[in-house]
């Protein structure tokens, strides 16, 4: 008897269901796949070096041969015939080394494809990753932070290890542009068929774009977009080398970039979910009261950009609980006791009075956004409570103490006239006193005052200066005062010049 078409389709679907559920998973692993396997959501690509920055081939210049083959794109397969290989040799007293430039800041590691060697045993090498030539040449000091030394506290960048005679090996997980390889094994010769950087990234389209008649400004825009793109790992990091953590304050300018360049991306809601799980109330986000304020601002901006009411409702209890937590720490006279430590960003930390004024403005901003969130959630009592907190905070408005971070927040929140804020401090000295985190809010203050040309000039001066020094992504910290007599990051530092990364960076 012939089965009815609908029944036949149902039986076929039932039979095929297990195969569909485990599609792409080897049969041997399928029984445990749901319990122990997590799919890697990131993409990988292999990148050939763009140039050889320096090499040490011994006093007779004979320890390295045919290094130009490393600049050719390979197929990733090892070979034992030693054809088209870079040959590196060491003696008792001299060790060959190469320093490679991959052209742009990357996140990932390194892949060595071997072409055999003079030893049956593995050979000892030292591999140093660097965001600058200076860092790739530097010595590590992990016991204490010292100028001119590098650290491995967030991502291992200085690795001494054995590599195989044949085959291939992958090393590292960090942020870098440069790699130095030293052959430490005495009296050994190794053949390197390929040295490739492993780029680990999200394969997503650039939906937003910016183009004008100022090519420097165009390059600044795309560099900012790429900087954030690299930080979009499984979660949204503050940086690909350090700290590699979801910081709720650093997230805000990243969120604004993502929404304009990439549109909706799950890295934002996933990171906000993770933050709430890591720091349940009454804990402060990242252990910092200021970053709980940024959480509310981030929630508002994400809803404003996406209209995702379901995600907002998912966080309604946390939002309400945080509003009530803050309310209990602001008295009727406008005095607040959220936490003993006040924080805006690291460059401003020395100006205690200015930070205090800016921190209070940040509370007002967070409550303004929390008011809107509460209305969207239909929680009118919380919405009114936010207004009450704002009114109490406005009873005690402190001076900015010539701190650009503070004046910018005060202008954004309406605690200070934007034009006055710009005239008194934000515009003074142009890009001097700007920072890589709070520079966004300084530009917002300039825009509120209608100072658009001034803002563009500062963008070209401050962010453009990093490009002039060889940056391919923007740095965690930067100050225009560092520029005089500074060497670029993409060449060895000459004697008498400042190492802008080693002397000032991390």
Model regions and ranges:
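Bacterial N-terminal signal peptides
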Residues: 10-20
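Short, solvent-exposed coil/turn segments
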Residues: 93-95, 240, 353
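Bacterial N-terminal signal peptides that target proteins for export
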Residues: 1-12
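Active-site core of glycosidic bond-cleaving carbohydrate-active enzymes
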Residues: 247-253, 257-506
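Extracellular/oxidizing-compartment recognition motifs
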Residues: 24-234, 250, 266-268, 310, ...
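Short helix-loop boundary/capping segments at the starts of domains
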Residues: 16, 230-233, 277, 281
């Amino acid at each position: 008897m012939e089965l009815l078409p609908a029944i036949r389709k149902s039986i076929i679907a039932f039979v095929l269901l297990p195969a569909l559920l485990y599609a792409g998973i080897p049969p041997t692993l399928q029984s445990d796949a749901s319990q122990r396997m997590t799919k890697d959501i990131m993409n990988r690509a292999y990148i050939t070096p763009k140039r050889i920055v320096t090499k040490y081939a011994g006093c007779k210049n004979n320890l390295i041969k045919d290094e130009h083959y490393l600049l050719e794109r390979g197929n990733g397969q090892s070979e034992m015939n030693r054809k088209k290989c870079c040959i590196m040799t060491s003696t008792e007293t001299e060790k060959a080394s190469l320093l490679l430039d991959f052209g742009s800041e990357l996140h990932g590691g390194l892949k060595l494809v071997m072409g055999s060697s003079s030893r049956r045993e593995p050979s000892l090498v030292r591999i140093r990753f660097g965001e600058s030539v200076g860092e790739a040449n530097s010595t590590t000091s992990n016991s204490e932070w010292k100028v001119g030394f590098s650290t491995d506290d967030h991502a291992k960048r200085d690795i001494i290890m054995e590599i195989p005679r044949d085959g291939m090996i992958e090393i590292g997980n960090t942020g870098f542009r440069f790699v130095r390889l030293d052959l430490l094994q005495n009296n050994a010769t190794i053949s390197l068929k390929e040295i490739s950087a492993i780029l680990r990234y999200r394969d997503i389209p650039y939906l937003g774009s910016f183009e004008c008649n100022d090519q420097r400004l165009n390059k600044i825009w795309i560099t900012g977009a790429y900087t954030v793109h690299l930080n979009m790992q499984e979660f949204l990091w503050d940086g690909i080398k350090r700290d590699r953590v979801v910081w709720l304050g650093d997230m805000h300018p990243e969120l604004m970039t993502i929404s304009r360049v990439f549109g909706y991306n799950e890295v934002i809601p996933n990171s906000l979910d993770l933050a709430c799980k890591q720091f349940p109330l009454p804990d402060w986000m990242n252990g910092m009261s200021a970053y709980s304020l940024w959480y509310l601002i981030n929630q508002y901006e994400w809803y404003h950009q996406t209209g995702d009411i379901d995600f907002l409702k998912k966080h309604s209890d946390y939002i309400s609980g945080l509003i009530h937590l803050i309310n209990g720490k602001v008295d009727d006279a406008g005095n607040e006791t959220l936490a003993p430590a006040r924080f805006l960003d690291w460059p401003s930390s020395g100006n205690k009075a200015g930070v205090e004024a800016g921190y209070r403005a940040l509370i007002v901003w967070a409550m303004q956004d929390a008011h809107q969130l509460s209305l969207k959630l239909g929680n009118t009592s919380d919405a009114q409570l936010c207004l009450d907190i704002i009114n109490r905070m406005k009873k005690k408005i402190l001076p900015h103490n010539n701190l650009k971070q503070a004046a910018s927040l005060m202008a954004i929140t309406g605690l200070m006239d934007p034009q006055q804020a710009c005239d008194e401090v934000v515009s003074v000295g142009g890009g001097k006193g700007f920072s890589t985190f709070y520079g966004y809010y300084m530009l917002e203050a300039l825009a509120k005052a209608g100072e658009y040309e001034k803002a563009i000039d500062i963008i070209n001066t401050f962010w453009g200066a990093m490009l002039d020094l060889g940056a391919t992504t923007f740095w965690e910290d930067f100050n225009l005062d560092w520029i005089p007599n500074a060497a670029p990051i993409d060449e060895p530092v000459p004697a008498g010049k400042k190492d802008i990364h080693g002397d000032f960076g991390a």
